[in-house]
């Protein structure tokens, strides 16, 4: 469950290291975001000499949350960290690599480029 002011790790090589959620895209009064939701975030920490810089506002899709994800078959998935992938306006990732495992639900939400770059899909 990601809400405004939540800090997230970045799971790609776009140049950002840490994001802070400032808005959840989708509804005007939505309180929490889950895996597969798009958020507006500000970069809190960045790698030097990369295209993305600190205090830049970006869009990101959430790929891992500490809060459990229940599936229809009864399986529960929980990750060790909150992580997101920086995307552009079309939903394509800005980085060329994805780090760590991601959930299968992203494929159903048409983030197929992120799923294809991921080393492991749970």
UniProtKB/Swiss-Prot annotation:
It is found in: Plastid, Chloroplast. GO terms for biological process: translation. Pfam families: Ribosomal_L14 (PF00238). GO terms for cellular component: chloroplast; cytosolic large ribosomal subunit. The keyword Ribonucleoprotein applies. InterPro entries: Ribosomal_uL14, Ribosomal_uL14_bac-type, Ribosomal_uL14_CS, Ribosomal_uL14_sf. GO terms for molecular function: large ribosomal subunit rRNA binding; structural constituent of ribosome. Keywords: Chloroplast, Plastid, Ribonucleoprotein, Ribosomal protein, RNA-binding, rRNA-binding. It comes from the Eukaryota. HAMAP family: Ribosomal_uL14 (MF_01367). Part of the 50S ribosomal subunit. Belongs to the universal ribosomal protein uL14 family. Binds to 23S rRNA. This is Large ribosomal subunit protein uL14c. It comes from Atropa belladonna (Belladonna). The lineage of its organism: Eukaryota, Viridiplantae, Streptophyta, Embryophyta, Tracheophyta.
